[in-house]
């Protein structure tokens, strides 16, 4: 599993850089690049409920292999339509559709491979490999595009999916009996929502996910605006900012595995939200580049550590037979919040300035931490009363 996810992350590093550069080259506008983001979000909104059903109905490994093989074909075909902007958007849409299947399947597979005490370490290993791949290979991808062209970068991505599919095909998981497998797909999707809504911990996590997405969608997308307008730095400054986030994101899980193995500690689940809120508040109030860049390293660490503990708790608490549907629902919540945040953040930046965007982002993250922690505390008290 780790080797397959790492191989896929290598290809993603090349594809992310190459796709952004390709769209900018063909359109020459930020709106054109934003179109790719929309093309990547829409498939998740359309397919997530049914993708979750597929994961619960079939083996997660089988779903991942099929998704990877689909991504091989799509990624390999991208150079053929590289001259057409609609063609590029169509490929981005198809890649995201396959990922809408792969991601909940991958989340469902890990808790079937390791026990609960190993979830933190397992998620940390996967996350760290992905972040390090981005840090190391993103500059290499830019160099490949500059010297060889776009085609090689996308073929590297296709090859990475082929390697991932080959490695995953050797995994064999025991699949829990799906008691809803004989029901209609829509009924199964609806039952997954009922599982989420009826579980105190999952509700708390969903509320935190929604508020965090409303914050992160805008602050991440508009970081380049903050670097340019508030800190007065150009492309090099933006690159350094991303590097600072990457260093923090790589260090976060490594530190986390030394501190805890229990994924149910609220301080390590929702505490990272408060850390990220503090960073957003700093970015909204300071103009000193060194301070801002240093805080971004903390943001990266909080994001990665929070993602690991959040996903580990989600995997530990979700009933095995409903994992695919619940994880797909969380993907849907994230993308809906991200899409809303992009629109609202752009409007707020134009109306009140970039500082207001980061101040609002900080407030949303504080709310996410407080609401999420309250939900977990309520669950714990409920369990104690039942005893």
Stretches with model-predicted labels:
Residues 1-387:
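Alpha-helical transmembrane-bundle signature of multi-pass membrane transport and export proteins
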